[in-house]
């Protein structure tokens, strides 16, 4: 029992502190439980979206590979060199923002195309222009899917770690802090009850002692009164015959 409670002095002030702590622990448990449920729900949604994004990525990359093969066939094998030489500024860009989910900030990545930059407008002008344009569109969708997948996987990793930490806190509060606090409160209540019983027994003994002393004093006073009354009766009895003798003597004198 002592190992499952806190080492405290059993006083009423400590009891009040433990009750406040228990109330705070219950509130914290409720909040963390709701937070864990909200994060778990979002985690499952992200997991489903990751599966969908991976399937979409597979289809897009397969289409992109065929499109690149068509471009290579239509324009020649040096298309890669031409593309690298044409690029000066990134046209496809990514911006990041943060989303607050139950106090957890998740990084969100969004891709966008700068319409003012178009370094590939002359690529494929000689031949294969249609295939090059189609490949550009397909690979743009592929990059968008990659950015979406990266955003989801980043959120997945963050949520996974936060959920583990939150669940550990929930379990610690539920199985350690709350039981220890309840055991401490029960211990303090039992000790205070024992102190109350001891105090009641002590007061009862003091009251009995006072009652015995009062009864003893009353008995002594009664005994003194009885003795005084008895002495007064004896004195009265001794004085009464002398008065009768005196009267008798006077009567004898008158008759004689």
Swiss-Prot record:
Gene Ontology MF: a single term: proton-transporting ATPase activity, rotational mechanism
Membrane topology value: Peripheral membrane protein
Domain of life assignment: Eukaryota
Compartments reported by the entry: Vacuole membrane
Region (Disordered): 211-256
Residue spans of biased composition, Basic and acidic residues class: 211-230
Keywords: Hydrogen ion transport, Ion transport, Membrane, Transport, Vacuole
InterPro entries xref list: V_ATPase_D (IPR002699)
GO cellular component: fungal-type vacuole membrane; Golgi membrane; membrane raft; proton-transporting V-type ATPase complex; vacuolar proton-transporting V-type ATPase complex; vacuolar proton-transporting V-type ATPase, V1 domain
Similarity section: Belongs to the V-ATPase D subunit family.
Subunit architecture: V-ATPase is a heteromultimeric enzyme composed of a peripheral catalytic V1 complex (components A to H) attached to an integral membrane V0 proton pore complex (components: a, c, c', c'', d, e, f and VOA1). Interacts with RAV1 and RAV2 components of the RAVE complex, which are essential for the stability and assembly of V-ATPase.
PANTHER family named among the record's database cross-references: V-TYPE ATP SYNTHASE SUBUNIT D (PTHR11671)
Something else known: Present with 8500 molecules/cell in log phase SD medium.
Protein's name in the database: V-type proton ATPase subunit D
Designated gene of the protein: VMA8
